[in-house]
Amino acid sequence: VEKIIESSLLLCALSCILTIFLIILFIITQGMPIILKEGPVDFVTGTTWDPYNDIYNIFPMIVGTFVVTLLSLVIAIPLGLGCAMLIAEIAPHQVRSIIRPAIETLAAIPSVIYGLFGLIVLVPFIRDNVVPFAHDYIGWIPLVGGLVGTQGNGFGVLAGGIILAIMILPTIISISEDSLRAVPRELREGSLAMGATKWQMITGIVTPAALSGIVAGAVLGMGRAIGETMAVLMVCGNSTIIPTSLLSMARPMTSAIALEWNYASGDHQVALFAIGIVLLAVIMILNLVIYLANRKKLNFARM
């Protein structure tokens, strides 16, 4: 009986591996022809996406993807780490019992709901309040004015970054909290015995010791942000021009696939598969970073 169970479990594992391998192989075989036709360098670094004239360069989409993702991380990492510190080190049990279900609920909300919230609430707020404020009070400041921008209709990098930050917060909070809790109790007690305050203990001892896990949470959140489609499609504006400011519109790579697939054919469809290859490569690199960070975390735990 045990042999049958072990064989069944092995078969399940091999089926998962085979499925992933076949999906990757399918996407690569479907998308590689356009990469070879355009040239890998031109495909990735060119700035023109014009399916009607058979020109397929995705650099504006790559920039849009990473700018929106970077903004979401800038917002979500401090908030997520602060919340994780509160739950793991400071808050009493009654407070934790309220915060944790709220975070789990946040993680369970469908992305289209986040998109609707952004479309109905966030985009009009940016258009009616942030854009006029930036135009009147920030636009004249060197560097900062150019970074923020002074023109916009509410759709763009800022809206996408805020929505993605809200979406990846549960991931960053959960993994960071687990990493903070995994730090040996002896380190906490030793630092307090040496006269450190609780805040000094948290920031000077516990957080550095849990850093690899915190980084893994941030990278996992980054992977979630890069792969998100519906929410960013609804609030980013879907412009294929390189975004030059936070108020500029952008089109992340996932949005391009979702928007254009229904009417794409021929080389256009192949180019969308090629975008999928780039996304796969990015996600695989991020997974490798997470694996290495978790290995370091496990090595620390064994010490």
Where are these regions (language model features)?
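Membrane-interfacial helix termini and adjacent extracytoplasmic/periplasmic loops
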Residues: 37-56, 116-166
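Interhelical loop and adjacent transmembrane-helix boundary motif
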Residues: 232-280
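Transmembrane-helix boundary motif in ABC transporter permease subunits
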Residues: 72-103, 134, 290-296
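Periplasmic/extracellular loop-to-transmembrane helix junction in inner-membrane transport proteins
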Residues: 1-3, 7-8, 28-72, 92-93, ...
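N-terminal signal-anchor/first transmembrane alpha helix
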Residues: 1-25
